[in-house]
């Protein structure tokens, strides 16, 4: 399917980043921040051709003069005008395609409200005139990307984390759990604990620097208390990081204290269970007969699962919670940052999937509610 003329488009809209590309490719062609920026002040330069809004990287680079908004909060679209701008930017500026010539596969958060799926469907057919479209649940696509149809996915991105048990390709809605703790919270927490060390990061520009520190230097400790002791008694865990202005900062126990919040949300002042317990609780909400398959197929997905050491720690924590004879396997594919998109690329290029698309004709006959009958 390298034939871009008929290739389906796959668009994974996350709270933090939008991933887009062509079905059949092994990675997204475009990855950009899910932000829309509007000028704070009237243009000073007359005739500068000032745009009334900027999307993605351009909004990010001009953030000094813009008000930035994220149209997707905790995985769910909350601002449709801005969302439309992001899709427009995706098709015309990033992929440089005419959406009316390609089927479009969109992704949605687990437990996405029904009205939202209908609105996505309506915008695709009425605003972008797509010939066909489909809406797939993000975690299910991640599971497909790992070559499975049964398992439990811990999907953790920038705005939200979910544990989604899936049996024979179907997500089990009664057992899906959501945790409002994800990448953005960890970045904020790292800003806070670096401030305690005497480094001050406050602006949105500095937040991006901290996000980079987090992605490059943080890791999950197998045993938190032991790691804290090691960090206190030696400098073996210290790493240095050069800021854009050339100043070098040193970071020690912050490296593993930051992602530890995933396992101990109390660090962030949250009362919820950690990701290990949430995964276990999700499994326990499932039928007793399928739990064995879920324990043995626990798949990590999303950018916030990219910390070194996270799979070993999950293995250790879930082993402590599960029955002692249970076989537990944590699958952490190296490409898991993009596994939702990759799963979409695989799905949309399957010959057996071609009958699953919602066509323009079906939409015209049934209206937006067709999405509930065809996408589940």
Curated annotation (Swiss-Prot):
Its main location: cytoplasm. The modification Methionine sulfoxide is found at residues 45, 48. SMART domains: ACTIN (SM00268). It comes from the Eukaryota. It catalyses: ATP + H2O = ADP + phosphate + H(+). Keywords: Acetylation, ATP-binding, Cytoplasm, Cytoskeleton, Hydrolase, Nucleotide-binding, Oxidation. One of its GO terms (cellular component) is cytoplasm. Gene3D superfamilies: 3.30.420.40, Actin, Chain A, domain 4 (3.90.640.10). GO terms for molecular function: ATP binding; hydrolase activity. Pfam families: Actin. Residues 1-2 form a propeptide. It is found in: Cytoplasm, Cytoskeleton. The modification N-acetylaspartate is found at residue 3. Oxidation of Met-45 to form methionine sulfoxide promotes actin filament depolymerization. Methionine sulfoxide is produced stereospecifically, but it is not known whether the (S)-S-oxide or the (R)-S-oxide is produced. Actins are highly conserved proteins that are involved in various types of cell motility and are ubiquitously expressed in all eukaryotic cells. PANTHER family: ACTIN. Belongs to the actin family. This is Actin-3. It comes from Limulus polyphemus (Atlantic horseshoe crab). The lineage of its organism: Eukaryota, Metazoa, Ecdysozoa, Arthropoda, Chelicerata.
């Amino acid at each position: 399917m390298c034939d871009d003329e008929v290739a389906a488009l796959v668009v994974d809209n996350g709270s933090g980043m939008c991933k887009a590309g062509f079905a059949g490719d092994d990675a997204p062609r475009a990855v950009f921040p899910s932000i829309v920026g509007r000028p704070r002040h009237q243009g000073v330069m007359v005739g500068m051709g000032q745009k009334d809004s900027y999307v993605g990287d351009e909004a990010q680079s001009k953030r000094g003069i813009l008000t930035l908004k994220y149209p997707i909060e905790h995985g769910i679209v909350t601002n449709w005008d801005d969302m439309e701008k992001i899709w427009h930017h995706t098709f015309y500026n990033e992929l440089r395609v005419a959406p009316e010539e390609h089927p479009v596969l969109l992704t949605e958060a687990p437990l996405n409200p029904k009205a939202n799926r209908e609105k996505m469907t309506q915008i695709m057919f009425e605003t972008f005139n797509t010939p066909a479209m489909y809406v797939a649940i993000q975690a299910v696509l991640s599971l497909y990307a790992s070559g499975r149809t049964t398992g439990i996915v811990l999907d953790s991105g920038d705005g939200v984390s979910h544990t989604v048990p899936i049996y024979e390709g179907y997500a089990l809605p009664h057992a899906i759990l959501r945790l409002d703790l994800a990448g953005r919270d960890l970045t904020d927490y790292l800003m806070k604990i670096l401030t305690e060390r005497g480094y001050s990061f406050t602006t949105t520009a500095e937040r991006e620097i901290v996000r980079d520190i987090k992605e490059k230097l943080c890791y999950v400790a197998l045993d938190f208390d032991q790691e804290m002791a090691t960090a206190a008694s030696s400098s073996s865990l210290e790493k240095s990081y050069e800021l854009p202005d050339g100043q070098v900062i040193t970071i020690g126990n912050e490296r593993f204290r930051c992602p530890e919040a995933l396992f101990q949300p109390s660090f962030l002042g949250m009362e919820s269970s950690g990701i290990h317990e949430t995964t276990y609780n999700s499994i326990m909400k499932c039928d007793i007969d399928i739990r064995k398959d879920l324990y043995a197929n626990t798949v990590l997905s999303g950018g916030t699962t990219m910390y070194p050491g996270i799979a070993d720690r999950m293995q250790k924590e879930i082993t402590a919670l599960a029955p002692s004879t249970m076989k537990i396997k944590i699958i952490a594919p190296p490409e898991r940052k993009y596994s939702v998109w990759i799963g979409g690329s695989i799905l949309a290029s399957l010959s057996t999937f071609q009958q699953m698309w919602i066509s323009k004709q079906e939409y015209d006959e049934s209206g937006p509610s067709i999405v509930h009958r065809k996408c589940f």
